Amino acid sequence: MKELALWQEVQADLQQVEAELLRQVDAPDPVLSQAARHLVQAGGKRLRPAFAILAARCCGAPLERILPLAVALEMIHMATLVHDDVIDASPIRRGRPTVWARWGQELSLHTGDYLFARSLILVATYDDPRIPSVLASVSVKMVQGEIQQLAAAFDLDITLRDYLDRIYRKTALLIAASCELGAIAAGADTATIRHLRYYGRNLGLAFQITDDVLDMVADPEQLGKPIGGDLRQGVITLPAIYALQASPKKQKLIHLLGKRDKTQAEIQEAIQLIKDCGGIKYALDIAEGYLERARKQASYLPPGVARDTLTSLTYYIRTRGF
């Protein structure tokens, strides 16, 4: 992340998460172990373990209670990334070759499956039945979100409701679960668990919307991959949904977005049309609405540094560059 001051609140804890991640992904097979370690060492924001840790801190729980869960959440997230890269045939992620690009499809799929299976072992260390129950439900819905996205590829009739349902399943659910499960593992009361779940849900929706915006406007070096990846794959995101209704050059945009073999120049042209009619601003305004809802939920949490950090994260999400 923006190694901002607010993230320093959990930096030491995230270092322990990182060390435990590397320990957990070791496999008897050296190639599988190498592929899994490659994925961990590619880095990332580690948002999901951070949210679980901050949620637990709101409730006064030590890292020891939350560490297995925090690592499991990141492993589930990494498993989805490996599978995404296979589906999208993505050669680069976070500025490094993907597991798919380096080891091929079969090992990539096995690596994702292995990470998910290892996460189950960690989750099984908790006695509270709500923890595996929530994660099982979330995992099913995440897969449904991925299938929704595949089924809707190049579908220019996608609605705002369709889009929000897809990103809720694909992204927001796991962030909401990270907050909720951090509170459950910490022994929080029902109201605190609910506020943290809704905080994560709203922040997760805003995070994915801004991620979709960044795919059109970010610096490719900061992003770690070329921009326009969604348009190339036929994934119609919120800025494009708005532009398909509002652009004075709607027919041109329909032609560009509907093409299955776009050149980079055509992708850039489509992005410019989306920008020109206000698609980026519209999407960011929608994201800001969800961030405001997240701040409202955070205001109900016990006062302290953890709550302040959760609130500060809502402002970071809106202004991040990658």
Explain the meaning of each model-derived region.
Residues 1-322:
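All-alpha prenyltransferase/terpene-synthase fold signal
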